[in-house]
């Protein structure tokens, strides 16, 4: 069994009565395989992730895989809440579907409620243009084929220079840094992990628009 972990930083959560807070979360991923190409996921049925804050599981993001001929379909269900003194300050409820043909993304659709605000993405591959066409809550237009969906199941997220937000469709250039291999202990069992950091290339973006994982 392979094991990975990611630090997810929510940089800015604001209300009229709140200061700026930083909430470190850890996403734990358990799977029998984890590779950089979709063809390597053959035989894999699901990847389950726990979202953990301060040692407590506060939600999940789970992926389910289906393969038929040359088409692989990935379905995602995500739900978690961050609470401060009993008050929910950040929440995600999301469903998404990705489709790949011969390892190439051809379709993506998601519906998300982030802090009860609705977001969405509809993406299709245009064969004549050889580009992605995106209709999203934050972006509508074209995207080059070197963009990937910013979902954690796909190891390509660590090799790509651009990602498409799975929540809103916005395109962000990113810088990926491999921090190193680390050993962590969970439930009295030791795991060798790989620790990466993802940041937005454009540091002039507002904090709530930046990548900082």
Name each model-derived stretch:
Residues 45-127:
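N-terminal mature ectodomain segment of secretory-pathway/periplasmic proteins
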Residues 21-30:
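Sec-dependent N-terminal signal peptides
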Residues 42-44, 111-205:
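Solvent-exposed helix/loop surface patches that form functional interfaces
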Residues 14-21:
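Positively charged n-region of N-terminal signal peptides that target proteins for export
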Residues 34-38:
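Boundary at the C-terminal end of the N-terminal hydrophobic targeting segment
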Residues 1, 12-14:
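Polybasic, lysine-rich low-complexity intrinsically disordered segments
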Residues 3-9, 30:
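Aromatic (phenylalanine/tyrosine) cluster motif
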Residues 75, 91, 193-213:
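Gly/Pro-enriched, hydrophobic low-complexity segments
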